[in-house]
Curated annotation (Swiss-Prot):
Pfam family, one: Formyl_trans_N
Gene Ontology MF term list: methionyl-tRNA formyltransferase activity
Identification of the protein by name: Methionyl-tRNA formyltransferase
SUPFAM superfamilies linked: FMT C-terminal domain-like, Formyltransferase
Transmembrane spans: none
Gene source species: Pediococcus pentosaceus (strain ATCC 25745 / CCUG 21536 / LMG 10740 / 183-1w)
Function of the molecule: Attaches a formyl group to the free amino group of methionyl-tRNA(fMet). The formyl group appears to play a dual role in the initiator identity of N-formylmethionyl-tRNA by promoting its recognition by IF2 and preventing the misappropriation of this tRNA by the elongation apparatus.
Cellular component, GO annotation: cytosol
Gene: fmt
HAMAP family referenced in this protein's UniProt entry, alphabetically: Formyl_trans
NCBIfam families the record matches: fmt
Family indicated by similarity: Belongs to the Fmt family.
Binding-site list for (6S)-5,6,7,8-tetrahydrofolate: S111, L112, L113, P114
Amino acid sequence: MKSIIFMGTPEFSAPILQSLIDEPNYDVIGVVTQPDRKVGRKHVLTPSPVKKVAVKNDIKVYQPEKLSGSAELTELIALNADLIVTAAFGQFLPMSLINSVKIGAVNVHASLLPKYRGGAPVHYAIMNGDKETGVTIIYMVKKMDAGEMLATAKIPITDQDDVGTMFEKLSLLGRDLLLDTLPQLIEGNVQPVKQDEEQVSFSPNISPEEEEIDINLPARLVDAKVRGLRPFPVAYFMMEGKRTKIWKTKVIDQTTDLKPGQVVSKTKHELLVATGEHGVISIEELQPAGKQKMTITDYLNGVGENLHPGKQIIDNDKSK
């Protein structure tokens, strides 16, 4: 039986941890996750999904605000584990910890490396309109997501997928790929492959500025941006001067000569807006500032009489 330290935080990581716990050949001797965070309007202190799995299975949990230089780091090194497995942990691992394990430290990364190194690979794959993504298992090294690749698996991105659905799919894909790869790694039957540095791209954590949708983009990429930021952090337009979160859009198979951001047509249940490259989108769910998420029908009930074809309702000036 091989001993494992598992490190992860969000929902993506939880099924991967559970699979290692369920495997009789592995002994998860410690779980490292981010500290409990205040969540929601009531700021309820909430454990991470990974912590919930660990506690349920009576596994010791470590939650350093910063692992490097912490007392927890010293204790983890002293565990003398066979393996470290990380999956969306959210912190850099000190080399002293990586070098302390007997077999190796591996990371389950939610992209087809070397594409999309960094903290938001799923968001960027969808926002950029990619047709596929996947999971790569790599050795942990000092440089972020730059280790040699041990295994990869691909999965399509559909026009209906968002970050939530892709995280679910990629979590299970990563779980299965890890369970296939670890026995080969333990037996020494894996041939690591270096990443092609010329093909590297990055997916940094989403900044507040990145959340605004550029209506000058083609309709396909406007919709991809909405899905690529749903269910978090949620994209927005500046609609008639107010920040309005956009939860759901649909690409319409028609063209228009109206300027991006202008109303193409409006009914009681539909609002079509012009995008870049003569495209058209339907806004289907949105959330005006200070209000709850609502359907376009409910929104139009309140403001519909003020909207007419040709009216500029979305700011299309991205130069500010």
